[in-house]
A protein has these predicted regions:
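S-adenosyl-L-methionine
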Residues: 1-27, 37-44
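Class I SAM-dependent methyltransferase "Motif I" SAM/SAH-binding loop
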Residues: 32-36
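Conserved SAM/SAH-binding beta-strand->alpha-helix loop
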Residues: 57
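Conserved SAM-binding strand-loop segment of SAM-dependent methyltransferases
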Residues: 70-79
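A short acidic, Gly/Pro-enriched loop at the edge of an enzyme's catalytic core
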Residues: 80-92
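A short glycine-rich, Lys/Arg-flanked "PGG" loop and its adjoining helix->strand segment in the class I
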Residues: 108-123
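Class I S-adenosyl-L-methionine
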Residues: 138-202
Length: 202
């Protein structure tokens, strides 16, 4: 499994990962983490959590992956090819403002993505998915109908999902990610949040 710290790429096997995670009960993963600012914020403000950021684009991660936090790890991997080393370890998953192939996978109910999330997770894991209007528009969906499509795909895959919640510009401005702030000050400062938990494997 490839990890990154600054500009250095490092291989981490199952045993090395187990050593890093030892002593942490709450292990969360941010999928499609972008520049890693959200992961850095959570790890710095929640020392009892272990926070993992995952993205395929290593260049964006150079800055935040440099931080010397023992409870933070960045992994280079695709959402459709999640590392098996993580199976059964994750208690909470976040997907913040996805676009491109990650958003497309959520919209189509991609089997590799949905099953991968389920296998990563411990019993009764929770998930937060935040969607923005601009990315959905680029994919050919309105915010409301795109959110409904993803909601239905998650329900069909065995997730219990609460009623979607609208995030306004103020909520986006105060959310600790670079992309949220860009959305807040952009031409379409709207987003939706889906929160739920897994009840069964798909």
């Amino acid at each position: 499994m490839e990890t990154i710290r600054g500009r250095k790429s490092l291989e981490l096997d199952f045993y090395g990962l187990a050593k890093r995670l030892s002593g942490y009960d709450h292990i969360m993963m941010d999928l499609g983490t972008g520049d890693g600012r959200y992961v850095h914020y959570l790890a710095e403000n929640n020392p009892g959590w272990f926070v993992i950021g995952m993205d395929l684009c290593r260049e964006n991660l150079h800055e935040h992956s440099r931080a010397k936090l023992q409870n933070m790890l960045f992994i280079i991997a695709s959402a459709q090819e999640l590392p098996r080393e993580l199976n059964g370890l994750i208690s909470h998953v976040t997907i913040n403002f996805p676009w491109g192939s990650l958003l497309e996978g959520l919209l189509t109910g991609d089997t590799k993505l949905i099953r991968g999330l389920a296998y990563l997770s411990r019993s009764a894991p929770s998930v937060d998915v935040r969607l923005n209007g601009g990315a959905l528009a680029e994919a050919g969906w309105a915010l409301e109908t795109g959110t409904e499509q993803i909601y239905n795909n998650m329900i069909g895959a065995g997730w219990h999902v609460n009623t979607p919640v609208m995030l306004n510009a103020h909520a986006l401005r105060t959310f600790p990610s670079t992309w949220a702030k860009r959305i807040a000050f952009g031409c379409d400062p709207r987003a939706m949040e889906l929160s739920g938990w897994l009840s069964s494997l798909p």
